Amino acid sequence: MGRIIGIDLGTTNSCVAVLDGDKARVLENAEGDRTTPSIIAYTADETLVGQSAKRQAVTNPTNTVFAIKRLIGRRFKDDEVQRDVDIMPFKIISADNGDAWVEAQGRKMAPPQISAEILKKMKKTAEDFLGEEVTEAVITVPAYFNDSQRQATKDAGRIAGLEVKRIINEPTAAALAYGIDKKQGDNIVAVYDLGGGTFDISIIEIDSVDGEQTFEVLATNGDTHLGGEDFDNRMIKYLADEFKKEQGLDLRNDPLAMQRLKEAAEKAKIELSSTTQTEVNLPYITADATGPKHLVVKITRAKLESLVEDLIKRSLEPLKVALADADLSVSDINEVILVGGQTRMPKVREEVSAFFGKELRQDVNPDEAVAIGAAVQAGVLSGDVKDVLLLDVTPLSLGIETMGSVMTKLIEKNTTIPTKASQTFSTADDNQSAVTIHVLQGERKQSSGNKSLGQFNLEGIEAAPRGMPQIEVAFDIDADGILHVSATDKKTGKAQNITIKASSGLSDEEVEAMVRDAEAHADEDAKFEELVQARNQADGMVHGTKKQIEEAGEALPADEKEKIEAAMANVETAVKGNDKEAIEKSTQELMEASAKLMEIAQAKAQAQQGQPEGEAKAAKQDDDVVDAEFEEVKDDKK
């Protein structure tokens, strides 16, 4: 059995970890970084992921996709999506089924398909480290993700060629990372997770009894559309407004300028965590008839705090709800752990510390804790980590729509999963032969105020007066927090059951098509990499040969030189094309044509080998000069 890896699929950055011995280890990607920007760029020739995508974002803003996690499992008409439509430089569109999709380079793509590119990069990072193929993973999601968003994340894993063994909530993963090596007794921990695009709070009890650790989630709450991106957007708006005030030009109409502004705003926000004032300086940000314009704005930490004050306050409301749901008060919390890059902001730390009335833990890396926890959970599933029991909860209530458009709950929020629940319902009309089971997720009494997860029909009910037929509806939530529903007519035994797919979401056929597409692209990517290597080798050969011709000078016969130059011209022509075999063939021919040149170069090198040695001896005899000093004398001063 292969290794199961742990992946933190983040809004802004992603991270992968694996169990190395008895410790989880965060892996460095090909660029040497422990986290990878969750950015994907589409060009005419290739798909870029991570740092390479981020670097070219300024020149390719409409085809560079970031914060895709904010769209995963969402409908285009959702208020949160509509807010992003107005501010994102890339195009967010409505799919045929009403989902929010993205259009780049003329291709329409589902968020799971785009997220899969990041997961593929994480998979490759792990494979490079382990030296073996990886096919299984534990992937983290915000605790407050609904069923559709969890399903979409599993779909992304499948498209990336990963079997998702478990979906685990991010705060729970962070608690695992924090508590796994602390074997003290009972401890109630609050995990405040403010990431790039989502916010969660989880209250978790860590018990240690007879060597076994139990991590039990008592309550969870959050906001899946609150995070560092929102903080950045406040800064971007402020800078754009200041520029408009000063220059009379609105940068919002210029995608290139807005991309530069986004990068500068993010950088300034980060700087203001360690300094009290910074300057945003963007020369040549735009131009008008009078010439180029430059943006220069000084911003203080106090100004930034005033811009985002309401966002920080917004994150405190779910804390109150989670404590109430867990039936605890602030004084019952033993430790407070901060997770997510945005928690580095001093004002966030200050407000959270004031809310709980205690010092915050400083020994948890906010960027890596979630991936480490995912790797620990992967170890639990593979049997490498023993004596750890994880009891997570469903974040939102689940139920069905009943008469009068009322939501009747079958499973209350914060119920430990996996779990089952059933209830008996009846018909609303005489002689009704079918019922529609409309599955909902949320806390509102009115059906329309909740998230519709899907619906199905139970047909063939025997004719009877209303209220007589007995229809049992059973809900079953698995360990990933994904719902399976069945409805059974107790009299006839007729049953209908489904795994809830979002009323939108991708069908199995669509996911399979995307898996095939990803596999095809993997072959393409491998071929492209081989082509680039062949080109690089050819370029290096031409460069080296030219240098050797210069060094050989008159020693190289004219006919040999002509032959080599013709071979070099062939290589230079081949490199411009896309035929790897042609490039390799011309490189080989150049190598053969350069045989005489190699002989001359070797003879020259051998002739020169004895020379410096003799000179050095003479120098030693003539003068007692230290070697290092001798080497530092410049030729023109000898």
From Swiss-Prot:
Residue numbers spanned by region Disordered: 601-638
Record flagged with keyword DNA-binding: no
Bias type Low complexity, positions: 601-613
Single annotated GO MF: ATP-dependent protein folding chaperone
Induction entry: By stress conditions e.g. heat shock.
Keywords assigned by UniProt, alphabetized: ATP-binding, Chaperone, Nucleotide-binding, Phosphoprotein, Stress response
Gene3D superfamilies cross-referenced by the UniProt entry: 1.20.1270.10, 3.30.420.40, Actin, Chain A, domain 4, Substrate Binding Domain Of DNAk, Chain A, domain 1
Compositionally biased intervals (Basic and acidic residues): 614-623
Residue numbers bearing the Phosphothreonine modification: 198
Acidic residues bias: start-end ranges: 624-638
InterPro entries in alphabetical order: ATPase_NBD, Chaperone_DnaK, Heat_shock_70_CS, HSP70_C_sf, HSP70_peptide-bd_sf, Hsp_70_fam
PANTHER family membership: HEAT SHOCK PROTEIN 70KDA
Function: Acts as a chaperone.
Family, similarity comment: Belongs to the heat shock protein 70 family.
Name under which the protein is recorded: Chaperone protein DnaK
Source organism of this protein record: Shewanella pealeana (strain ATCC 700345 / ANG-SQ1)
Native organism taxonomy: Bacteria, Pseudomonadati, Pseudomonadota, Gammaproteobacteria, Alteromonadales
